[in-house]
A protein has these predicted regions:
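Short Lys/Arg-rich cationic patches that frequently serve as NLS/NoLS or arginine-rich RNA/DNA-binding motifs
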Residues: 1-20, 28-44, 306
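Acidic/histidine-rich catalytic cores and adjacent linkers
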Residues: 100, 126, 247-258, 264, ...
Length: 362
């Protein structure tokens, strides 16, 4: 490109500038640079809860004496008034067995053998491998039918009286059985089978999972925000401030959070965002604040720095239960990711209880 063409291009770019692009100093506004802020270290109470949570969660999961009364009560309710052969296994028993499988990173056959050894010692019949597989598949089909077969949305039962400040984010889980050594030595690896996407609405204070959705990799982030919030509210959760990254900064999400739910929505924007409404007056107020100050100052004033907790959840679930999903069929992969998330949700609930105890004793 010649010097003359460059000058003409710069002139056209300046001509497209609007009055909103001019700062108080009288110069053209530069996009707010997203500075890298220093990482926040966990407090002593949080570190203690992090250390105790795996021990207490494993103990609670393996303590079958706490689960047997629940199994018997649910079986009695299922068989009440039933004509014909009575039920032998309740849904909570199937979920408990698959949770053990997720916890030990085993197979269905391993979980069936472990359940047989535990339940038969307490006078209860354990499901076989084939029955365990069939019942888990039936539960997945039931969840898929609730949303038209496109995705799964689940809301947590960890309801409290006070509003929760929540963050939303998504991450992918690998469906390929990758082998890094084969790639390192021979320069080849298995064919990619794709990804599953997990969308999580979590409590930024405790890390608990409030609601989550499982979709394919092509599903966008922004369209899942409203269904996740609606699922959480329908389950009885009270929503406080909602934190999200720039992928969720649509006018529809602003109208839903600020208008319908009546709460604050804190999200970032693209660096070239202009302070205009863009279809929502709530979004216009947020963009004007975004463009009026440097990034570090905006983070401090808006409270956006709390959003990082929603990303930590994905790091935790992949570290505890693995990032890859080993299954032959897509339904099997969805079922395994679903149980990973359900088990992780119970783990975070246990951590929240420990954290509240640590804070109370300090």
């Amino acid at each position: 490109m010649t010097r003359r063409n460059k000058a003409q291009r710069n002139l056209k770019t300046d001509a497209r500038m609007t009055p909103y692009d001019v700062k108080v100093k009288g110069t053209f506004a530069e996009p707010p640079k997203k500075e890298k802020l220093p990482p926040r270290k966990p407090t002593s109470e949080e570190q203690r809860a992090n250390n105790l949570a795996p021990v207490e969660f494993s103990r609670e999961s393996a303590s079958v004496g706490n689960w047997i009364p629940l199994f018997r009560k649910e079986l009695a309710e299922m068989n009440s008034g039933k004509v014909g052969r009575p039920y032998s296994f309740c849904d909570s028993m199937i979920i408990w067995i698959i949770s053990l499988q997720t916890l030990i990173k085993g197979t269905y056959r391993t979980a069936a053998g472990l359940a047989a050894a535990i339940l038969e010692d307490h006078g209860m019949k354990a499901p076989s491998y084939s029955r365990l597989f069939e019942r888990s598949a039936e539960m997945l089909d039931r969840m898929l039918s609730e949303n038209g077969g496109t995705y799964i949305i689940r809301a947590g039962s960890n309801i409290i009286d006070s509003p929760r400040n929540v963050g939303i984010d998504s991450s992918g889980f690998n469906l390929s059985n990758t082998c890094l050594w084969r790639k390192e030595k021979w320069g080849t690896g298995p064919k990619r089978r794709g990804w599953l996407k997990l969308h999580v609405l979590s409590d930024v204070d405790t890390g608990e999972v409030i609601a989550f959705a499982v979709t394919d990799k092509n599903t966008g982030d922004s369209p899942l925000m409203i269904p996740l919030l609606d699922a959480a509210v329908a389950a009885g959760h009270r929503i406080g401030i909602v934190y999200a990254d720039g992928a969720y900064s649509s006018a529809e999400n602003f109208d839903h959070v600020c208008g319908r739910l009546g709460t604050r929505f804190v999200t970032s924007f693209k660096v070239n965002t202009k302070p205009v409404n863009g279809g929502s007056r709530y979004r216009g107020e947020a963009t004007r604040l975004w463009c009026s100050m440097p990034y570090a100052e905006w983070v401090e004033k808006s409270g956006y720095g709390r959003r990082w907790k929603s990303e930590c959840g994905f790091s935790d679930v992949k570290r505890l239960f693995g990032e890859s999903i080993h299954a032959f069929t897509m339904k099997g992969a969805v079922r395994k990711l679903l149980m990973k998330t359900e088990t992780f949700s119970r783990y975070k609930e246990q951590r929240a209880i420990l954290l509240s105890g640590c804070l109370a004793s300090s």
